Amino acid sequence: MSHQSDLIETDIDAYLAQHEQKELLRFLTCGSVDDGKSTLIGRLLHDSKMIYEDQLEAVRNDNSKHGTTGDKVDLALLVDGLQAEREQGITIDVAYRYFSTAKRKFIIADTPGHEQYTRNMATGASTCDMAIILIDARHGVMTQTRRHSFIASLLGIKHLVIAINKMDLVDYSQETFESIKQAYGEVAKTLGQENLYFVPMSALDGDNVVNKSENMPWYTGESLMEILESVQITGAKNLKDFRYPVQYVNRPHLNFRGFCGTVASGEVKVGDEIRVLPSGKTSKVKEIVTYDGNLDKAFIDQAVTITLEDEIDISRGDMLVHAASDVQMSNRFKAHLVWMSETNMAPGKEYLFKFATKVTPGSVAAIDYRVDVNTFEHSSIEKMELNDIAVVELALDQQVVAESYQVNRGTGAFIVIDRLTNITVAAGMVIDVLEESSEAKSDFSAFEVELNALVRKHFPHWDAKDISKLL
């Protein structure tokens, strides 16, 4: 089978230009173990003619050694890249795949199904616009289905495709499809998910993946590919509120001072009056500079360099917003936290918190409750362990611009970094901005404060609390 475009062999520049203006859709696949995630992705790539002859030949050669589908070509081998994945027949790491059709470009995040890889799935879901949740038609809605749906909802994914797979093993039964559809509807109602698309399919045989199935004439809806090509996902992004975290101050010579970064949300035009946070100083946009020339307007996700009419002291970590924007800064937040480290988290330990380009020390002041991702029940805990998801209260040393993740992904997401190892130990989503603490302060002598600072600097593994915050 050949690639869908002959241009890639004859004129690579023309091929790239052809795809440059297409809209990009990022989606992830998730489901229980052996629901067919990797097979589905392999089928998407195969039927949309995005596989080269040598790739397909390699899969045929590996089929006898690692294949799990008998005489049929195991398309999952196209995407199960790690040797351990192939040998166990499961997905372990998040694998990103790229393909395109005549209408759209796609990035797929193939995420693990096992509960011990919850952190991997959360990572894959963080940049996606849509989730494909696979359900085995023989087993229906399972505990893992609820877990994946909860994580997708937590990460702000508004569009869910419920792919009821392996319909060939239940004789393409409409009754089975309707039963699972009703059962999942109850789960979605609990999570407040409304944009649902149900598709009966067989990824192994290709039914309703790219092409409509002749085995299920009772299904009159769209195939999976038709949904992927037509779904409108602009509503999931904040196109209104301009937020521009400064990543780098570019000063190549005395006559140029530009502020580099990526537009986190909204848009900005030349001449717009902007405000710099945290300083609060205002100016107007003079130029929007890119490698390909200046722009009149910059949109969400565009990487640009902005210059201002006035000389203002701006550094990495500052945020540019429209002057009229009502933006609240604080150093206390309520947030969902996904713990990704094998080292447990205890409230009060000091970490680095990274909001966009802003990094500040801080700690988890309190754990409100842990969320059971399988049952959605809440429980009290004293510390967070690997793959735990909890609602916590953050106390930061410095004020930052942060908003609810459900309102603005660009300013509502953050990561937590261990100060000693520099390893990312958690990812979080802001739920609410809290008022600054007005708790009663403790009294410590200057010597005690100085000694505490010395201990925290030279013996960070002791996890000493910063008593200066209690003054």
From Swiss-Prot:
Write down the EC number: 2.7.7.4
Q: Which cysteines are joined by disulfide bonds?
A: none
Q: Which Pfam families match?
A: GTP-eEF1A_C (PF22594), GTP_EFTU (PF00009)
The region called G2 is annotated at: 89-93
Locate the region G3.
110-113
- Annotated region G1: the residues are 31-38
Q: Where is this region: G5?
A: 202-204
Q: Where does GTP bind?
A: 31-38, 110-114, 165-168
| One GO BP | sulfate assimilation
Q: Which InterPro entries match?
A: CysN_GTP-bd, CysN_II, CysN_NoDQ_III, G_TR_CS, GTP-eEF1A_C, P-loop_NTPase, Small_GTP-bd, SO4_adenylTrfase_lsu
Q: Which GO terms describe its molecular function?
A: ATP binding; GTP binding; GTPase activity; sulfate adenylyltransferase (ATP) activity
**Part of which pathway?**
Sulfur metabolism; hydrogen sulfide biosynthesis; sulfite from sulfate: step 1/3
Domain tr-type G intervals: 22-237
- What catalytic activity does the UniProt entry give for this protein? sulfate + ATP + H(+) = adenosine 5'-phosphosulfate + diphosphate
List the keywords (alphabetical).
ATP-binding, GTP-binding, Nucleotide-binding, Nucleotidyltransferase, Transferase
EC top class, in one word? transferase
Which portions of the sequence form the region G4?
Answer: 165-168
Q: Does the keyword Nucleotide-binding apply?
A: yes
Database matches in NCBIfam families: CysN, PRK05124.1, PRK05506.1, small_GTP
Q: What protein family does this chain belong to?
A: Belongs to the TRAFAC class translation factor GTPase superfamily. Classic translation factor GTPase family. CysN/NodQ subfamily.
- What PANTHER family does the database record attribute to this sequence? TRANSLATION FACTOR
The record describes the protein's role as: With CysD forms the ATP sulfurylase (ATPS) that catalyzes the adenylation of sulfate producing adenosine 5'-phosphosulfate (APS) and diphosphate, the first enzymatic step in sulfur assimilation pathway. APS synthesis involves the formation of a high-energy phosphoric-sulfuric acid anhydride bond driven by GTP hydrolysis by CysN coupled to ATP hydrolysis by CysD.
Protein name (record): Sulfate adenylyltransferase subunit 1
Which source organism does the UniProt entry give?
Answer: Saccharophagus degradans (strain 2-40 / ATCC 43961 / DSM 17024)
| Gene that encodes the chain | cysN
